[in-house]
């Protein structure tokens, strides 16, 4: 299961809850990345970018060795779909969507590892960055499998999402 959406759209919160509801392991790119920061240190934006790419590689390696998992990441639309399809099996996408202003508000309010470099930006810069990302954001990854869009503007009930996912998860995997 692939959880996608804008930064601060509620991906990690929903992914954790779905993994628990479904009894699946959670592979969270931020957890991997923060572990790399702890081991290798916090640096500038170029360092962050390098560790982020390494974190992506670790995430995909773990996913390739895991039969059934919830994957949480800020996916790159240029590269992620092909890499995800290479994993094989059923790719069910859960797309988290929320208002860009709310995403900017959440982004500014959240506390993350210092390696993410979030606090180096003013609230205005964060709002502008999220608005630019949203304006150019292509939406769901559209991996060719089932897609469930979830409005994450308000609190989401994981049990309700799990019920909506049940028929998507139960459908047979078609070759090809």
What residue spans do the PLM features occupy?
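Small-molecule kinase domains that catalyze NTP-dependent phosphoryl transfer to phosphate-bearing small molecules
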Residues: 112-161
